[in-house]
């Protein structure tokens, strides 16, 4: 069994999401061969040298899962693209490039965060290219912590404001980009997050059937894609209320 999740946007202000994730690590993930986290794991990440006590606790929880035998793979999202080798080493996880092709159930599957598929949002794509440039990352990682915190808040607020103003089709994936990149990598299954629109889309690429699986964001409920001998299954689950969690 392999589990894939994305867009948890973990932060201290959402203890319900954190509890649900820790429950997953202590339960089903212990039985899994691997756990893939496809970006926006944290709501914000300003550097491995600036881990808060909350982020450190998540790191330790991942390490415990890794030490139990479950392999963990982490991909950058647009919120946490500054996660580096230091965090991954401490957490016992492997950093995946975006995109990456992996073998799931004997099938070549393309994994992405998904933001690079939104090519109609030209302003975002330009900003993404700038922020991910090695020189930009080097500069950002060497800014004072206070400056990084202020910059992260500014970018997050601007992103939220712009997303609200943009048409739905602009912030969703570009239809033509999906078959293009799937053909480029020679796959018939694409799994991504980012858009917060969970679904399994059936496609036709040339004369072959294909599919695009969109992972859900963890906000009002959690989402997990499970891959096992039965195939690919995308399911949601409700968060356990705090009072119930305390009783248990």
Curated annotation (Swiss-Prot):
Biological-process GO terms, alphabetical: lipid A biosynthetic process
Co-factor binding details: Binds 2 Mn(2+) ions per subunit in a binuclear metal center.
Primary localization class, coarse: membrane
Location of this chain's protein in the cell: Cell inner membrane
HAMAP family the record matches: LpxH
Function: Hydrolyzes the pyrophosphate bond of UDP-2,3-diacylglucosamine to yield 2,3-diacylglucosamine 1-phosphate (lipid X) and UMP by catalyzing the attack of water at the alpha-P atom. Involved in the biosynthesis of lipid A, a phosphorylated glycolipid that anchors the lipopolysaccharide to the outer membrane of the cell.
Name by which UniProt lists this protein: UDP-2,3-diacylglucosamine hydrolase
Organism: Pseudomonas savastanoi pv. phaseolicola (strain 1448A / Race 6)
Lineage: Bacteria, Pseudomonadati, Pseudomonadota, Gammaproteobacteria, Pseudomonadales
